[in-house]
């Protein structure tokens, strides 16, 4: 059985010519049948891709040919199936979107903590441990002692800090995320806001799960990942979660037994969030997916993704209205 190397990577580095990198990077991915998405911006590179061992090694060698990307941070895991449908290299304003101007992890950032030293830090009662990930990620797994900010997107994090954290009260703050990149931005932001002792887990949750034995671990549950595996367990293997193709949120076997679940159309988390017209489109898309599967092909559709972005924008506008009415 063929195995795929899933490679999550990022690096904050000045890439003024990032638009010119897109074409050759796309070419090396396509030539080596690597799928996934990489983001390029003037502040660096970020993304997750998957391919054969030889293909991923070729990509990493390609990065080494550019001195700016030679030491790109990456973490690998293995999967039995290709977790991505497409090959994409996108140009962005930020490689991880916080929406705050002037936050530069190359200028200031929190203190990195190795996975081997993480347990001791977060067990300190004087340390406030904050999970910087989104609410749906935290729901399926997090560290013992961690606070859930209940953010819907990373853009909500600055508001959480403004409303809940105080440099005079919270002297020591530790943060973590999936692979480390969000903490680069969040710790930089915290330092800019006057927080002195700010720490973050080097390599993120994935590196911790890789290096810390499960019997010594303070991780509880599974770790959400942004690919077809949905979530991984402590052994970095695909766990029991699937994804609802209507809202893209993780679902369990129990969710699939609910009367609110219709494959590709709705789940208990989104049953009331889509119109009947939207659900009809989802049913048609699911039909096309099944037909493609019968032909041994992969169906790629965009309706669900568009609706998710629309829903995020609606929630953002609702929050802004609530804040302005206070």
Swiss-Prot record:
EC number: 1.14.-.-
Domain (Rhodanese) ranges: 123-217
Record has Translocase as a keyword: no
Region (Disordered): 276-326
Gene3D superfamilies recorded: 3.30.70.100, Rhodanese-like domain
Compositional bias of kind Basic and acidic residues: 276-320
List of catalytic residues: 177 (cysteine persulfide intermediate)
Catalytic activity: uridine(34) in tRNA + AH2 + O2 = 5-hydroxyuridine(34) in tRNA + A + H2O
GO biological process, one term: tRNA modification
GO molecular function annotation: oxidoreductase activity, acting on paired donors, with incorporation or reduction of molecular oxygen
Pfam hit, one: Rhodanese
Tagged with keyword tRNA processing: yes
Matches recorded under HAMAP family: TrhO
Function: Catalyzes oxygen-dependent 5-hydroxyuridine (ho5U) modification at position 34 in tRNAs.
Protein known as: tRNA uridine(34) hydroxylase
Species this protein is from: Aliivibrio salmonicida (strain LFI1238) (Vibrio salmonicida (strain LFI1238))
Gene designation: trhO
């Amino acid at each position: 059985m063929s195995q795929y190397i899933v490679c999550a990577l990022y690096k904050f580095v000045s890439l003024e010519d990032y638009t010119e990198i897109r074409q050759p990077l796309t070419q090396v991915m396509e030539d080596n049948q690597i799928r996934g998405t990489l983001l390029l911006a003037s502040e660096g590179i970020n993304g997750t891709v998957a391919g054969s061992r030889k293909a991923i090694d070729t990509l990493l060698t390609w990065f080494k040919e550019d001195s700016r990307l030679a030491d790109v941070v990456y973490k690998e895991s293995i999967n039995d199936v290709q977790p991505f449908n497409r090959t994409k290299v996108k140009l962005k304003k930020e490689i991880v979107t916080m929406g705050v101007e002037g936050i530069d992890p190359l200028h200031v950032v929190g203190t990195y903590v190795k996975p081997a030293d993480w347990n001791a830090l977060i067990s300190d009662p004087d340390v406030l441990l904050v999970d910087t990930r989104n609410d749906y990620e935290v729901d399926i797994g997090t560290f013992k002692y961690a606070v859930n900010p209940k953010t819907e997107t990373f853009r909500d994090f600055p508001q959480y800090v403004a409303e809940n954290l105080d440099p005079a009260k919270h002297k020591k703050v530790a943060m973590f995320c999936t692979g480390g990149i969000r903490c680069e931005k969040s710790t930089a932001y915290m330092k800019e806001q006057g927080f002195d002792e700010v720490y973050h887990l080097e390599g993120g949750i994935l590196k911790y799960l890789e290096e810390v034995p499960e019997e010594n671990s303070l991780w509880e549950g599974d770790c959400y990942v942004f690919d077809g595996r949905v979530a991984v367990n402590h052994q970095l293997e695909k766990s029991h979660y699937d994804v609802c193709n209507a809202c893209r949120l993780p679902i369990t076997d129990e969710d699939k037994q609910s009367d609110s679940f219709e494959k590709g159309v709705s789940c208990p988390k989104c049953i009331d969030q889509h119109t009947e017209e939207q659900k009809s489109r989802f049913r048609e898309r699911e039909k096309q997916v099944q037909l493609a599967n019968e032909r041994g092909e992969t169906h790629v559709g965009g309706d669900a993704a568009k609706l998710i972005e629309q829903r995020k924008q609606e929630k953002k506008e609702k929050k802004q209205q609530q804040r302005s009415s206070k």
